[in-house]
């Protein structure tokens, strides 16, 4: 596996991986915003099914809004991919109260993808806990055990938001419960310390050169008349949050 990954990386002029963790195999894909990330990972599922027969996929997203957008993308592109591959992916949004869909996901040999937001399995509420509970309505089984038994392929959309900065937070720990075959991480802005086994990079300049985006705008700031004896302002950091963006000025 390592040699195959290294060959792909060298062909793409990316830094080759020195080692891999086969117990937690992750591959990083960097794609500039607006270049078709969702389309790409849907096509990746079809190709993995075509080449290797893998049929169980889970897309993990950071919010309900993104979850709904991904679900809509599957609906919109359904005909396109069906025409190309001659089959359809059965997609559904995870709901702790609709357990029959999990049974279908696990037992059906066709391609299935479950779309789930982090709050549905990593929050502290009762709904989030149901996935780890033996449920009478589910023949005294735990939904997570049924899902994990399929050895799904995890696709993490916007991992910098899904995983967060804390290396031991609840989301990271709970993701291990899915026991994935491997994990694909798709984003334009990966956290530097979460980049592992980069196999594809489409940055802003590449996207512009390939005419996938219209233009790149860069704003410069010049300082005039400075004698270097006075204080000065500099951008210390940009703080990302669910609210308005904030910058820290030093």
Model-identified regions with their sequence ranges:
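RecA-like P-loop NTPase motor core of helicase/translocase proteins
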Residues: 1-250
